[in-house]
Structure formats: structure tokens, C-alpha cells
From Swiss-Prot:
Domain Guanylate kinase-like positions: 17-195
UniProt organism field: Streptomyces kasugaensis
Enzyme class: transferase
Residues where ATP binds: 24-31
Family: Belongs to the guanylate kinase family.
Chief location category: cytoplasm
Record has Nucleus as a keyword: no
Cellular component annotations (GO), alphabetically ordered: cytosol
Function: Essential for recycling GMP and indirectly, cGMP.
Descriptive protein name: Guanylate kinase
InterPro entries: GK/Ca_channel_bsu (IPR008145), Guanylate_kin-like_dom (IPR008144), Guanylate_kinase (IPR017665), Guanylate_kinase_CS (IPR020590), P-loop_NTPase (IPR027417)
Nucleotide-binding in keyword set: yes
Amino acid sequence: MAATFRGTTPVPPDARPRLTVLSGPSGVGKSTVVAHLRTVHPEVWLSVSATTRKPRPGEQHGVQYFFVDDEEFDKLVANGELLEWAEFAGNRYGTPRKAVLDRLEAGEPVLLEIDLQGARQVRESMADAHLVFLAPPSWEELVRRLTGRGTEAPEIIERRLAAAKVELAAETEFDVTLVNTSVEDVSRELLALMLRQSGERDISG
């Protein structure tokens, strides 16, 4: 089954590169979609976030995240060096502004995978950013995905479900919605959207 669009708007073919932001509720499959997209098309540039979270086994500085302490993160915020930032589970995460702007200036399409709070901040600071909402096929499917992980306590799952309802209600704030019925299909649709924003030709494969 193909991924489906809701609320698309035609974009002129000569449009300059625009920042593409992918957001959606927890459990909808954002990371899976992005990972698949970058496996098939490694030329897609995904912004690496800065975080105060401690590295997990196998994670490398500058690859999964830029790992910084609280003092360094405070400086990034104070100096306006973050395009957006948010706190989650006691740790802070933020998108370095300069790296994103440098890539856009070079004419490259840029992808951010962030939460609703971050997407709203990006919209405020970069009004021409293209916000893409990744939605589940149904609420029941999202509940199944969140409860099927089997790695979290019931109270955490309840908090995630409550947050998901708030995030789903914010869908109308986004420029376009992709329904995640298939990782392969929705990755292809996301790539097509990014290329459409930059005026590039589609990439087959």
C-alpha cells in the first residue's frame, strides 16, 4: 500500500532549497523512515543534534549526536547557535543552526527529524521551512506500536499515548501529511518532497 498525502501544495520547480522538517507522534516510525531513506539515498543530509544525554554503547560523537555537557548546551542556547531545542526525559536536545544554514546555502536539501515542540520553533525562526507530519494509518495502529515494544513501564506508555493525542491534534499546523502505511513508500514520498523543494530531479532507485 502506498503512502498517502494530505494537504499538499504545488511548489515551483525553480524554488531554492528549503529546510524539510519531519515530525509526528512517538511510535509512528520517524527514525525508521529516516534510516531507510538514508540507507537507500545516503546523499540525503540529516542534521545531527546536540544533546546533554550520555552516549549509549556504540554511539559516536558527531555521528548519532554531538554530546555536550549542560554548561556547553547553555552556551549554545545563549549564543543563539541552536535552531531549536527541547527537553525530554531530563536531557536536552537541539539542532545546531550553522550546519543547517551552511548546507542550505550550498544548495543542498536538508532534513530534520524532530518533535512537535522543535518543529514549532523551526517554523518561528525559519518561516519558509517545509513541515512534514508523519501520521499512523490509525490510532489503533499507533497504540499497537507503542504497546508492542515491550520495553517500557505501563505509566511511561500512558504518558506517550497522552502525548501522542496532543501531537496528532497538531497535524493541521504542518504543510503536508504522509501516512506511514509502508516504510519504503513513505521514504520515497519524503525524498520526492525534498527534491521538489530544491527543484532537483527525482532520484530513481
